Each structure stands twice: as C-alpha cells, then as structure tokens.
Amino acid sequence: MYDVVIIGGGPAGLSAALGAKKKGCGNILIIERSEKLGGILNQCIHNGFGLHTFKEELTGPEYAFRYIEMVQKENIPFLLNTTVLSVSPHSVTYINQEEGVRVIETKSIVLAMGCRERPRGALNIPGDRGAGIFSAGTAQYLTNIQGKMPGKRVVILGSGDIGLIMARRMTLEGAKVLAVVELMPYSSGLKRNIVQCLDDFSIPLLLSHTVTKIIGKKRVEGIEVSKVDEKKKPIPGTEIFFDADTLLLSVGLLPENELSRKAGITISPVTGGPVVDNSFQTNREGIFACGNVLHVHDLVDYVSSEAEKAGENAALYALYDRKEEKKVIPISVFGLARYTVPEMIHEDTKEDTTIRFRVSNVKKDGKIVVRINGEEVISKKKRIMAPGEMETIIISKRILDKYDSIESMEVGTED
C-alpha cells in the first residue's frame, strides 16, 4: 500500500511529491499520462518562471527540470504513459501498456491533473470550418515542440496569457499578428504580458470585440470581427475584415476534473475545480487537490507553493491517520470577489493561511478586506485589481491566535 499517490506529473504533482517526502513519507508514487514529467511547462519555452521560487528568471523547461531533478534525487518513483481511469478514497485504477489495468491501494491521493483549453465548439462562432483554426496551446505545441508554423497572418481571439504569449511567439517566428480580439472591456491576461507581448511588438488589442465570422472552406481566408455592446452582442455596422489565414483561440482554461466528478468530489461552479478546505482536502476524505485542477493560476510559482502544502497535508493524513472530525467554516465573499481558494477553513486553524481569489471586474483604488467573526482583521489597499490577476492575502498565525474558534470568515473588496 502506498502512503500518497499523486495523479499528474506537472509542476503541481512534482511539488506535491516533494512536500509529502518532506513530511517523512517514504512510499510515494507519481502517475503521469504523457511520456515525460513536467506537464505543460515542457512547451512553455519563454522566460518568466521561477522569480518567486528560485529568485531568478527561468524558461518553462528549466523550471520543470529543477523539480524533476529534486524528485529524482529523493528517489520518488513515477509511472509515465499511464492513464488513471478512476479514484476512490483509498484506491487508484490505472492503465498502461506494460501492466494493463491495475488497481493500487493508497492511504491518500493528491489530484494534480492541471487544466485544458476551452475548444472552438464551446464558442459557437459562425462561419466555415476550414483548416487554420487552433487553440493557442496547440499552436504553442506545434511551434515550440514540433517546429511547425500554424500560419502566416494571424488573428487571436481572447487575451488570456497563452494567447498573449503566442502573439509574441508567432511574431518572433515571422508571422504577422493582425490583432488580438477580446470580448470583455479588459484583458484577461497579466499586465506584464500585455506590455511584453503586445505593446513591445505593436500588436493591436481590440477590447469589447469578438469574431463574428470565419471565411474559408478549405483554409481560413479571412476573419470578420465586430464590436460588442454591454450585453456582449455584436453591433451591426461595426464589422472589421482581416485578411488572415489562421485563427488562434485563447478563450479560457477548464480544470481537468472528470476523475474528480467520478469520485463524487464536490466541484465549485465558479472555479470549475474541487471545493477544498485550508489543508487542500476535498469532501472525500483522504483526497487532496492542488494546482490548476483546483483553479487556474497566473504563475507556476504559486502552483508549486500551494501543491507543496497539499502534499504535506496528504502525508500527515497518511502517516498519522488524521481523520478526526473537524468543523469547517465556509469562507463567504463580498464586493467584487468571485470566490476564494480554499473555500473553507477549519475552526481551530492556528497557522498562516493563504487565501487566493479573483475579482469579477476591474477596480481602481480599492482595498481587500478580511473579517473574522464579524470583526475586520485585514484591510489592504490596492491601486488596481483586475480579473486577469489573482489576488493573494495571507492571514497570519498572530491574527488567528486571537480567536478560540472561527465562527465566520468573509473575504472581499471595498472602496
């Protein structure tokens, strides 16, 4: 029997394994469905990773390699080319070419499956279905891993971070990026990516616009873009035609939670990921979740720190049989805060607790407020908050020590 089985060998899975090892777990297994560890980082050859974790700027493969080296140094075993079919609180069923279908027993499980891109089918874009329509991640894989150019004249729908980064990558590879088109009146990517990927390369960003028609039977021959009103409906007469041969879609990421749903884990309708407490445990005892399977992060450094905590808690659960009934208090949100992760906190929490959330709209000169038992304990001024940037607030042990028990907690924004 394993102490901890980790599903996913990307940055979250690797960090969770190291966290479990740090707490004294000797019997750990990482299961990865692709042919190598590292997850999505292997195709992210741009820099900007590791500034928080390693205090230096790394590319995605360099960041992944450091964690793979640490995992190998700790002699943590892993399975590659292995697909998990189902999980339950104390067993994992997987399949691979060497062993066929196998069921293994484990004391705890960490879900670290990451996320996937929203496909074209979810967007209902009218027009033809010619070649030349890619998700931004697929275009990234073709360009960075396979060395193939998806197209020469490109329009990008959606201003998520992958779309912004691919606007720069396509330009550097010799393509002409005609425009990045965003439905919302604000970008959904990080401010630094807008500056480094669009402004520095003079790529136009069309806010409150969307693609209203794709032209081209065999291959994309043109893209029609229209301005939208407050209800996100295209405004007749505002059409712009782009002579493009490629459309890249960067229209959001979806946490990969088919296994979680099959296991009976409660999924948040806001994040699309499991509902967890401040130990990252789900409603199914012994099953923990971390990384982009939980909610989509801005920075891999945040994924690593969160996953390490999840791994540590999974190890403590496995080693010390931590199954006592603990009362958990839901964290409620107010103002522009859409959700929090974690969504619940143990009433007797006495350690620094990190709360992450996103706002529903751009807010300037506001503040983040935390209330415990109705009393305001944190008020942090923010010059600007935007949906594309995740907000982080740390509730210190010093604050939590003042309360014998937590009856209510609220996190939100105020003017």
What are these regions (language model features)?
Residues 1-3, 58, 80, 315-415:
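Rossmann-like nucleotide/phosphate-binding core characteristic of flavoprotein oxidoreductases
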Residues 1-7, 64-153, 229-237, 248, ...:
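FAD-binding core/adjacent interface of flavoenzyme oxidoreductases
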Residues 17-19, 42-43, 122-125, 167-169, ...:
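Short amphipathic alpha-helical segments
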Residues 101-102, 111-205, 212-219, 286, ...:
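Predominantly flavin-linked oxidoreductase catalytic cores and closely associated redox partners
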Residues 133-143, 246-297:
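FAD-site-proximal beta/loop scaffold in flavoenzymes
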Residues 290-334:
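A conserved FAD-binding loop/helix module that cradles the flavin
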